[in-house]
Amino acid sequence: MSNKILLDNIKKLREMTGVGFKDCKIALDETKGDIEKSIEFLRKKGIAKASKKMSRTASEGLALVKEEKGQISLIEINSETDFVAKNLDFINFCKELSEINFKTKSDLNKINDTKMNNGILVKDNLVNLISKIGEKIIIRRANFFDNLSGMNFSYVHSATEKDIGKIISVVKIAGISEADNKDLGNKIAMHIAASNPFAIDKDDIDKNIVDKELEIIEAEIANSGKPPEMIEKISKGKISKFLNDNSLLNQFWIMDPKKKVS
Protein backbone atom coordinates (compact mmCIF):
# COMPACT_ATOMS: atom_id res chain seq x y z
CA MET A 1 0.00 0.00 0.00
CA SER A 2 1.46 3.42 -0.98
CA ASN A 3 1.97 6.10 1.67
CA LYS A 4 -0.71 8.29 0.05
CA ILE A 5 -3.34 5.52 0.11
CA LEU A 6 -2.38 4.65 3.69
CA LEU A 7 -2.72 8.28 4.81
CA ASP A 8 -6.05 8.63 2.99
CA ASN A 9 -7.34 5.47 4.69
CA ILE A 10 -6.12 6.65 8.09
CA LYS A 11 -7.98 9.93 7.56
CA LYS A 12 -11.19 8.08 6.61
CA LEU A 13 -10.87 5.71 9.55
CA ARG A 14 -10.28 8.57 11.99
CA GLU A 15 -13.35 10.41 10.66
CA MET A 16 -15.49 7.28 11.02
CA THR A 17 -14.28 6.20 14.46
CA GLY A 18 -12.82 9.22 16.24
CA VAL A 19 -9.74 7.10 17.04
CA GLY A 20 -6.19 8.52 17.01
CA PHE A 21 -3.69 8.31 14.16
CA LYS A 22 -1.47 5.61 15.72
CA ASP A 23 -4.31 3.18 16.53
CA CYS A 24 -5.84 3.68 13.07
CA LYS A 25 -2.49 2.87 11.44
CA ILE A 26 -2.10 -0.27 13.57
CA ALA A 27 -5.64 -1.41 12.63
CA LEU A 28 -5.02 -0.83 8.92
CA ASP A 29 -1.69 -2.68 9.09
CA GLU A 30 -3.40 -5.62 10.82
CA THR A 31 -6.19 -5.79 8.22
CA LYS A 32 -4.09 -5.01 5.12
CA GLY A 33 -5.89 -1.71 4.54
CA ASP A 34 -9.48 -2.97 4.81
CA ILE A 35 -11.46 -0.14 6.45
CA GLU A 36 -14.46 -2.25 7.48
CA LYS A 37 -12.22 -4.89 9.07
CA SER A 38 -10.20 -2.11 10.73
CA ILE A 39 -13.35 -0.76 12.38
CA GLU A 40 -14.13 -4.27 13.62
CA PHE A 41 -10.55 -4.62 14.93
CA LEU A 42 -10.76 -1.33 16.85
CA ARG A 43 -14.14 -2.19 18.32
CA LYS A 44 -13.04 -5.63 19.49
CA LYS A 45 -10.06 -4.00 21.21
CA GLY A 46 -12.43 -1.56 22.92
CA ILE A 47 -10.67 1.39 21.27
CA ALA A 48 -13.63 2.48 19.13
CA LYS A 49 -17.30 2.60 20.04
CA ALA A 50 -20.10 1.84 17.59
CA SER A 51 -21.50 4.89 15.84
CA LYS A 52 -23.71 5.72 12.87
CA LYS A 53 -20.69 7.04 10.96
CA MET A 54 -19.27 3.53 10.89
CA SER A 55 -22.25 2.15 9.01
CA ARG A 56 -21.91 4.65 6.19
CA THR A 57 -19.94 3.63 3.14
CA ALA A 58 -16.52 5.26 3.14
CA SER A 59 -16.88 6.77 -0.33
CA GLU A 60 -18.04 9.89 -2.14
CA GLY A 61 -20.48 10.31 -5.01
CA LEU A 62 -24.14 11.07 -5.59
CA ALA A 63 -27.53 9.52 -4.93
CA LEU A 64 -30.49 10.34 -7.18
CA VAL A 65 -34.22 9.75 -6.92
CA LYS A 66 -36.97 9.91 -9.56
CA GLU A 67 -40.70 9.59 -8.96
CA GLU A 68 -43.58 9.42 -11.41
CA LYS A 69 -47.17 8.24 -10.99
CA GLY A 70 -46.58 6.22 -7.83
CA GLN A 71 -43.36 4.67 -9.07
CA ILE A 72 -40.01 5.68 -7.62
CA SER A 73 -36.40 4.76 -8.34
CA LEU A 74 -33.11 5.38 -6.54
CA ILE A 75 -29.55 5.00 -7.72
CA GLU A 76 -26.19 5.57 -6.03
CA ILE A 77 -23.00 6.22 -7.99
CA ASN A 78 -19.74 6.28 -6.03
CA SER A 79 -16.50 8.12 -6.75
CA GLU A 80 -13.30 8.17 -4.73
CA THR A 81 -13.31 11.89 -3.86
CA ASP A 82 -15.77 14.70 -3.27
CA PHE A 83 -13.98 16.65 -6.01
CA VAL A 84 -15.25 14.21 -8.66
CA ALA A 85 -18.77 14.32 -7.18
CA LYS A 86 -18.82 18.02 -8.11
CA ASN A 87 -17.50 17.45 -11.63
CA LEU A 88 -20.02 18.50 -14.30
CA ASP A 89 -19.35 15.48 -16.54
CA PHE A 90 -19.92 13.18 -13.57
CA ILE A 91 -23.12 15.00 -12.55
CA ASN A 92 -24.56 14.90 -16.08
CA PHE A 93 -23.72 11.19 -16.36
CA CYS A 94 -25.53 10.56 -13.06
CA LYS A 95 -28.60 12.53 -14.13
CA GLU A 96 -29.02 10.57 -17.34
CA LEU A 97 -28.32 7.34 -15.46
CA SER A 98 -31.16 8.16 -13.05
CA GLU A 99 -33.59 8.41 -15.99
CA ILE A 100 -32.37 5.09 -17.37
CA ASN A 101 -32.62 3.52 -13.92
CA PHE A 102 -36.29 4.49 -13.71
CA LYS A 103 -37.10 3.17 -17.19
CA THR A 104 -35.35 -0.16 -16.59
CA LYS A 105 -36.83 -0.53 -13.06
CA SER A 106 -33.33 -0.75 -11.57
CA ASP A 107 -32.23 -3.80 -13.56
CA LEU A 108 -28.44 -3.31 -13.49
CA ASN A 109 -27.84 -5.59 -16.49
CA LYS A 110 -30.31 -3.58 -18.58
CA ILE A 111 -28.85 -0.31 -17.28
CA ASN A 112 -25.32 -1.23 -18.37
CA ASP A 113 -26.52 -2.31 -21.82
CA THR A 114 -28.71 0.76 -22.45
CA LYS A 115 -27.58 3.39 -24.96
CA MET A 116 -27.23 6.90 -23.58
CA ASN A 117 -28.01 10.10 -25.49
CA ASN A 118 -24.62 10.01 -27.21
CA GLY A 119 -25.41 6.58 -28.68
CA ILE A 120 -22.87 4.78 -26.46
CA LEU A 121 -23.77 2.09 -23.92
CA VAL A 122 -23.82 3.03 -20.23
CA LYS A 123 -21.00 0.59 -19.41
CA ASP A 124 -18.79 2.07 -22.14
CA ASN A 125 -19.59 5.65 -21.13
CA LEU A 126 -18.61 4.69 -17.58
CA VAL A 127 -15.22 3.40 -18.79
CA ASN A 128 -14.70 6.62 -20.78
CA LEU A 129 -15.65 8.76 -17.77
CA ILE A 130 -13.22 6.88 -15.52
CA SER A 131 -10.46 7.36 -18.11
CA LYS A 132 -11.23 11.08 -18.43
CA ILE A 133 -11.51 11.84 -14.71
CA GLY A 134 -8.85 9.41 -13.49
CA GLU A 135 -10.81 7.97 -10.58
CA LYS A 136 -12.66 4.75 -9.89
CA ILE A 137 -16.41 5.27 -10.40
CA ILE A 138 -18.98 2.55 -9.73
CA ILE A 139 -22.74 2.13 -9.84
CA ARG A 140 -23.04 0.93 -6.24
CA ARG A 141 -26.74 0.09 -6.01
CA ALA A 142 -30.16 0.83 -7.45
CA ASN A 143 -33.74 0.21 -6.40
CA PHE A 144 -37.25 0.59 -7.80
CA PHE A 145 -40.60 0.71 -5.97
CA ASP A 146 -44.12 0.49 -7.34
CA ASN A 147 -46.69 1.89 -4.90
CA LEU A 148 -49.77 2.73 -6.96
CA SER A 149 -52.15 2.14 -4.03
CA GLY A 150 -50.38 4.44 -1.57
CA MET A 151 -47.82 7.22 -1.31
CA ASN A 152 -44.05 7.53 -1.68
CA PHE A 153 -42.10 10.06 0.36
CA SER A 154 -38.44 10.96 -0.11
CA TYR A 155 -35.84 13.10 1.58
CA VAL A 156 -32.60 14.30 0.00
CA HIS A 157 -29.77 15.11 2.41
CA SER A 158 -27.06 17.60 1.35
CA ALA A 159 -28.96 18.24 -1.88
CA THR A 160 -26.88 19.70 -4.70
CA GLU A 161 -30.02 20.23 -6.77
CA LYS A 162 -33.54 18.79 -7.01
CA ASP A 163 -33.58 15.01 -6.43
CA ILE A 164 -29.77 14.79 -6.17
CA GLY A 165 -27.71 14.63 -2.98
CA LYS A 166 -25.36 12.69 -0.72
CA ILE A 167 -28.01 10.57 1.01
CA ILE A 168 -31.57 9.77 -0.08
CA SER A 169 -34.22 7.94 1.88
CA VAL A 170 -37.60 6.78 0.58
CA VAL A 171 -40.67 5.79 2.56
CA LYS A 172 -43.35 3.69 0.89
CA ILE A 173 -46.72 3.72 2.68
CA ALA A 174 -49.68 1.80 1.26
CA GLY A 175 -53.35 2.71 1.52
CA ILE A 176 -53.05 6.41 2.37
CA SER A 177 -53.73 9.74 0.67
CA GLU A 178 -51.22 12.57 0.33
CA ALA A 179 -53.47 15.20 1.89
CA ASP A 180 -53.56 13.56 5.30
CA ASN A 181 -50.07 12.12 5.51
CA LYS A 182 -47.61 14.23 3.50
CA ASP A 183 -46.02 15.90 6.52
CA LEU A 184 -45.66 12.64 8.47
CA GLY A 185 -44.25 10.76 5.48
CA ASN A 186 -41.67 13.46 4.81
CA LYS A 187 -40.62 13.50 8.47
CA ILE A 188 -40.22 9.71 8.55
CA ALA A 189 -38.04 9.92 5.43
CA MET A 190 -35.93 12.60 7.13
CA HIS A 191 -35.66 10.46 10.28
CA ILE A 192 -34.44 7.47 8.25
CA ALA A 193 -31.76 9.56 6.52
CA ALA A 194 -30.51 10.76 9.91
CA SER A 195 -30.82 7.49 11.86
CA ASN A 196 -30.02 4.90 9.18
CA PRO A 197 -32.02 1.90 10.54
CA PHE A 198 -31.21 -1.58 9.24
CA ALA A 199 -34.87 -2.65 9.20
CA ILE A 200 -38.40 -1.60 10.17
CA ASP A 201 -38.53 -3.80 13.29
CA LYS A 202 -35.77 -5.50 15.28
CA ASP A 203 -36.90 -9.00 14.26
CA ASP A 204 -36.32 -8.00 10.63
CA ILE A 205 -32.62 -7.17 11.05
CA ASP A 206 -30.42 -9.58 9.09
CA LYS A 207 -29.18 -12.40 11.34
CA ASN A 208 -25.66 -12.10 9.92
CA ILE A 209 -25.52 -8.46 11.06
CA VAL A 210 -26.74 -9.40 14.55
CA ASP A 211 -24.30 -12.32 14.85
CA LYS A 212 -21.37 -10.14 13.76
CA GLU A 213 -22.31 -7.42 16.26
CA LEU A 214 -22.61 -9.99 19.05
CA GLU A 215 -19.17 -11.37 18.17
CA ILE A 216 -17.68 -7.86 18.41
CA ILE A 217 -19.48 -7.13 21.70
CA GLU A 218 -18.28 -10.37 23.30
CA ALA A 219 -14.69 -9.77 22.15
CA GLU A 220 -14.76 -6.20 23.46
CA ILE A 221 -16.06 -7.33 26.88
CA ALA A 222 -13.53 -10.18 27.06
CA ASN A 223 -10.68 -7.76 26.24
CA SER A 224 -11.85 -5.41 29.00
CA GLY A 225 -10.97 -8.02 31.63
CA LYS A 226 -14.52 -8.80 32.76
CA PRO A 227 -14.99 -12.31 34.25
CA PRO A 228 -16.47 -14.94 31.87
CA GLU A 229 -19.73 -15.19 33.84
CA MET A 230 -20.38 -11.49 33.18
CA ILE A 231 -19.82 -11.64 29.42
CA GLU A 232 -23.18 -13.24 28.55
CA LYS A 233 -25.15 -10.91 30.84
CA ILE A 234 -23.52 -7.74 29.54
CA SER A 235 -23.73 -8.99 25.94
CA LYS A 236 -27.50 -9.47 26.19
CA GLY A 237 -27.97 -5.89 27.33
CA LYS A 238 -25.71 -4.49 24.62
CA ILE A 239 -27.26 -6.52 21.79
CA SER A 240 -30.75 -5.52 22.94
CA LYS A 241 -29.71 -1.87 22.73
CA PHE A 242 -28.16 -2.48 19.30
CA LEU A 243 -31.41 -4.00 17.99
CA ASN A 244 -33.49 -1.10 19.30
CA ASP A 245 -31.08 1.54 18.02
CA ASN A 246 -31.06 0.04 14.53
CA SER A 247 -34.74 -0.78 13.94
CA LEU A 248 -36.99 2.05 12.77
CA LEU A 249 -39.98 1.44 15.06
CA ASN A 250 -37.77 1.23 18.16
CA GLN A 251 -35.63 4.28 17.44
CA PHE A 252 -36.18 7.55 19.26
CA TRP A 253 -38.01 10.01 17.00
CA ILE A 254 -35.64 12.79 15.85
CA MET A 255 -38.50 15.31 15.95
CA ASP A 256 -39.17 14.48 19.61
CA PRO A 257 -36.43 12.36 21.29
CA LYS A 258 -38.76 11.55 24.20
CA LYS A 259 -40.89 9.44 21.87
CA LYS A 260 -40.17 6.39 19.73
CA VAL A 261 -41.09 6.22 16.05
CA SER A 262 -43.74 3.59 16.80
Question: Where are each of the predicted segments found?
Answer:
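N-terminal assembly/interaction segments in proteins that build large macromolecular machines
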Residues: S2-S262
